[in-house]
Amino acid sequence: MSNTNTTKAKVDMLNGPLFMKILIFALPLAASSLLQQLFNSVDVAVVGRFASSKALAAVGSNAPVISLLINLFIGISMGANVVISNHLGQRDEQSIRHAICTVTLIAAISGLLLMCIGIGVARPILELMDTPSDVLDMAVLYLRIYFIGIPFFLIFNFGAAILRSVGDTRRPLYILVVAGIINTVLNLIFVIGLGMSVEGVAIATAVANAISAAWIIQLLRKEPGAIQLQFKHLRIYKKELKRMLQIGVPAGLQGMVFSISNVVVQSAINGYGAAAIAGSAAAVNFEYYCYYIIVACNGAAISFIGQNYGAQKYDRVRRIYRICLLMGLIGCFIANTLFTWQNQFFLSFFTTDAEVIHYGAIRMEGVLLFQFIACSYEVTGSALRGMGESMLPTIMTVFGTCILRIIWVFAVLPHYTGFAHLLQVYPLSWILTGAMVIIAYKLKMRQICPK
């Protein structure tokens, strides 16, 4: 790609009107996240329609485990985004180069470490979650093959974080479009053409991740200016690493604890049988689709606020937060309502089993319909992280969301055993966490920008 096209892909975050720039930044980011989720959704849909409901349950039961193991490293990539954005706002080119080198090596090392951990703990953690015996072996096989491709997944996500820090969300989207098409074609070949099951969709996902990683590394090597990746200069710079970890580790730990609570909830879901697992696995895809609207607003908040906070443009920081929050609330509410309204239709893409669809509809009506409330703490927490405040939203989210869900499963659910009662904890935890994080944001803004 030429330097001219590279420049056009970037967004000036420090000057001019904000709404359209944030929208232009956020839309490709939302589409990129949706395409990544489509990798998993295609896996779920193909095995659900062309293999079996048990294969669908095997793939779906792995989602909380995968999130648990990768969230720490995704948090560190968020820290890299903030650090690079701050340096861009300060126009510190040497620090930008050091950060690029550091984050690239961290991605490669983390990916290899996570691959080994994931392969090793696949069976023990699924057994700990009370995964039914009739789906356990398939779930273990899927998870182990999936983690063979996890180094490529992390390299792509860290590389995309670098491009997002300079306002470029379009080129990662182009990569994911191609990788998503390849993933879909390989799924159909392996499952329908070759008669494979969960192993086929796992291999297809790993191949798609490898293509994405190779492509984004090539883009970064050809970048002009300070964000160009030069292999001969690769090393870890302690100053940049320390700052990335200060911001990224709390965010990653939040994600891990969040996932632990979801693993506990998934374990409770497993107690309702294979149909409930499969129905929940199908329904959760639509939660992810809607959640990635929030993720796009999170990414915009981190990058825009990161640069403007670094440049000490605090009035713009306040306006950026409000725009991102409103975009997330409105966009997520519309998507939540649409999917829930036609839940039978959308669930039929994943399965034709009436009992599975029944459980999926219960989840959509009890969780998905209220998901827009999560914007209150997600976008606000991202705004705080863009200003370098990572620990506070982490602590509040851990208490307001994660601990409440665990308490609910062990203290409340034994007295109200219905599947719908289990799911009520989601909107309750979002309301509590949102209230706490918004108060923290207001206190931070009074500190840096007193009226």
Name what the model sees in each region.
Residues L56-C116, F153-P172, Q266, G279-T337, ...:
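Small-residue-rich hydrophobic transmembrane alpha-helices
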Residues A51-P64, L143, A202, A274-Y289, ...:
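Small-residue hotspots at the loop-to-helix junctions and early N-terminal turns
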Residues L34, L38-A57, L126-S133, I189-M196, ...:
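Helix-terminus/linker motif at the lipid-water interface of multi-pass membrane proteins
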Residues M13-F50, P64-G79, V83, A108-M115, ...:
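N-terminal transmembrane alpha-helices
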